[in-house]
């Protein structure tokens, strides 16, 4: 067995100019609420949602948003069923999203009472100048709505998180007034939202530092801080990692589904936290987690999707394959998993796969033949190698088997 720590120099931890300050945080899964708001996403059956809650729990996720109770009677009934499903789980707790409207809050209260489960109520309101201008909102009216909604939920005995939408484009003065009022009314968790995917990692850090030091600290209250990100600029995962430096809980969705181009990908976030040594848990349930969401939400997984796509641990390139094959011939799976992969396949319960195509070397052909029970004769190798070089793609196992002929 190789000592991989001595074979890989990790510039991510070098520290001479920049030092990652990521931390282990709580995780909130938004797949069953914000994730389902994606315009191309289908609403999965209730039994699938229940299974997803169990997988989230298996993955060590701390909480899950199970819907908008104020949306309809059907939505509220689904929330009741899902909240009841969490009762037997080891870790996962339910929450739901409500507008800062009394009717929405009452729907959350009713759902919690019917389920017999305290459902964390996440009361949200837009906060940025552009949103306020578009809506013709006055700050005094917004503050009145916040006071009514938060006080109502707190009085009913529900844990409350107060959320501002578009926080990453809102001015400090407005944010200070909205959050401070919510805390004074009893909210014990606040959430910053990058609703339109505007933020960079620097912006996330600046915003969370402001909320921690200039909003929460002066209240002297014990208040936790959440971060909710979107992926419009392709920065969802790195922003979420940056948020862990200061946030108590970070949000994400399976496969990054959600509004427009989606949310932070929870699966990718978990893989990165694992690789940084910030979570120590079995990540093999991620395979079923993303497969269920893909199948029942109608979201195809791209072949090149990080860690979980079909091509994540697959190569037909001669140079790459040769290195992996040599590691496998040393009977060193860990070495094979890392020599040409930044994410070990074994973390996901997967394996490196050697294919044969136009970019392959002969070693690809020999490996494929031996691993599929064929004798690697010179004629067979040359026949397959010639066919691969003439092809414009990776050859399928069926095509290779036909070229290989009978096993001996």
Range-by-range predicted roles:
Residues 22, 27, 38, 43-62, ...:
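Alpha/beta enzyme core
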Residues 42, 68-72, 94, 98, ...:
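Hydrophobic alpha-helical scaffolding
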Residues 1-100, 353-356, 360, 371-372, ...:
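N-terminal capping/small domains of soluble enzymes
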């Amino acid at each position: 067995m190789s000592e991989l720590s001595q074979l890989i120099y990790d510039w991510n931890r070098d520290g001479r100019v920049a030092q990652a300050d990521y931390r282990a945080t709580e995780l909130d899964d938004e797949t069953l609420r914000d994730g389902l708001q994606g315009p191309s996403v289908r609403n999965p059956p209730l039994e699938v949602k229940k299974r997803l809650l169990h997988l989230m729990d298996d993955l060590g996720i701390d909480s899950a948003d199970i819907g908008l109770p104020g949306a309809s009677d059907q939505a509220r009934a689904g929330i009741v069923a899902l909240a009841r499903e969490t009762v037997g789980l080891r870790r996962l707790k339910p929450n739901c999203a409500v507008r800062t409207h009394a009717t929405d809050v009452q729907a959350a209260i009713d759902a919690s009472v019917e389920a017999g489960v305290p459902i964390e109520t996440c009361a949200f309101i837009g906060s940025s100048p552009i949103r306020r201008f578009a809506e013709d909102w006055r700050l005094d009216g917004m503050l009145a709505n916040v006071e009514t909604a938060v006080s109502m939920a707190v009085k009913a005995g529900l844990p409350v998180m107060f959320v501002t939408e578009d926080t990453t484009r809102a001015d400090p003065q407005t944010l200070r007034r909205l959050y401070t009022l919510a805390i004074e009314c009893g909210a014990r968790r606040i959430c910053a939202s990058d609703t339109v995917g505007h933020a960079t990692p620097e912006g996330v850090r600046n915003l969370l530092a402001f909320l921690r030091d200039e909003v929460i600290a002066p209240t002297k209250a014990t208040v936790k801080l959440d971060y909710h990100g979107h992926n419009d600029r392709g920065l969802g995962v790195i922003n979420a990692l940056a948020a862990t430096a200061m946030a108590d809980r970070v949000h994400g969705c399976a496969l990054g589904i959600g509004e427009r181009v989606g949310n932070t990908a929870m699966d990718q976030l978990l893989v990165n936290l694992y690789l940084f040594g910030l979570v120590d848990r079995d990540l093999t349930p991620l395979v079923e987690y993303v497969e269920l969401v893909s199948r029942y939400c109608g979201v195809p997984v791209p072949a090149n999707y990080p860690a979980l796509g079909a091509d994540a641990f697959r190569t037909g390139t001669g140079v790459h394959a040769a290195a992996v094959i040599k590691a496998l011939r040393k009977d060193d799976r860990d070495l094979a998993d890392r020599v040409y992969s930044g994410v070990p396949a074994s973390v996901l319960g997967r394996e490196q796969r050697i294919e044969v195509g136009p970019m392959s070397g002969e070693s690809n052909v020999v490996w494929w033949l031996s691993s599929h029970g064929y004798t690697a004769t010179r004629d067979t190798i040359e026949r397959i190698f010639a066919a691969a070089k003439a092809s414009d793609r990776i050859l399928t196992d069926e095509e290779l088997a036909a070229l290989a002929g009978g096993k001996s």
